[in-house]
C-alpha cells in the first residue's frame, strides 16, 4: 500500500476558568468525538499563524499562541491517512467562549468548555488530553489509530 505523506496540523489548548475549550468538527453530527480547536497547516505560514487562523475559523475567537506542549500522531491502519498534530498552549485575546456561536462554514457543530471531571466522560482525542491541558509539561503521543 502506498502511504501519503503525513498531514501536519496545529491545535490550541485554551483554559478559561479552569475549563478546556473543545469542539466537535464533524459536520451534521456524524461523530460525538471532541478535540482541541485547530486544523491543517498551510505552507508559507508559521505554525502559530496557522493556529491563529484555524482557531478563529473553528471557534470565532482570537488567540495568542504560547509554547508547544504536545506532538500527537494518529493514522488509519487500513488506509493511507496519517496526521501529526502539534499542540500549543494559547491565551484568549478577543471573543466570548461562553457566548452562543455558530460556525458559518457548518463544520464545527459544537463548541464547549469542560472541566477535567467532565472530560473524563466524553469521547476525546488524544487520550492524554487531560494530563496535557491541566498538568503542564511537554509530551509526545506515539502513533495511534484514528477514531471516528
Residue ranges and their predicted role:
Residues 17-19, 26, 91-96, 116-118:
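Short loop segments at secondary-structure junctions
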Residues 62-70:
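A short coil-to-beta-strand element that immediately follows conserved catalytic motifs
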Residues 16-57, 61:
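Conserved Nudix-box catalytic region and its N-terminal flanking loop in Nudix hydrolases
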Residues 6, 13, 34, 61, ...:
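Residues that recognize and position ribonucleotide moieties
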Residues 2-6, 33, 78-84, 103-108:
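A generic structural micro-feature
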Residues 1-21, 71, 89:
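Conserved N-terminal beta-strand and adjoining loop/helix that marks the start
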Residues 74-98, 112, 133:
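Active-site-adjacent beta-strand/loop module that shapes the phosphate/pyrophosphate-binding cleft
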Residues 29-34, 103-148:
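Nudix hydrolase/Nudix homology domain
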Amino acid at each position: 500500500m502506498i502511504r501519503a505523506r503525513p498531514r501536519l496540523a496545529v491545535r490550541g489548548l485554551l483554559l478559561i476558568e479552569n475549563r478546556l475549550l473543545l469542539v466537535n468538527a464533524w459536520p451534521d453530527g456524524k461523530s460525538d468525538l471532541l478535540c482541541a480547536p485547530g486544523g491543517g497547516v498551510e505552507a508559507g505560514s508559521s505554525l502559530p499563524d496557522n493556529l491563529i487562523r484555524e482557531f478563529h475559523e473553528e471557534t470565532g475567537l482570537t488567540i495568542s499562541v504560547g509554547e508547544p506542549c504536545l506532538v500527537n500522531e494518529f493514522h488509519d491502519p487500513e488506509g493511507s491517512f496519517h496526521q501529526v498534530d502539534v499542540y500549543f498552549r494559547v491565551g484568549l485575546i478577543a471573543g466570548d467562549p461562553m457566548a452562543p456561536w455558530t460556525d458559518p462554514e457548518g463544520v464545527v457543530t459544537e463548541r464547549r468548555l469542560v472541566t477535567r471531571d467532565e472530560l473524563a466522560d466524553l469521547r476525546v482525542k488524544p487520550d492524554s488530553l487531560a494530563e496535557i491541558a491541566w498538568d503542564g509539561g511537554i509530551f509526545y503521543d506515539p502513533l495511534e489509530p484514528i477514531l471516528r
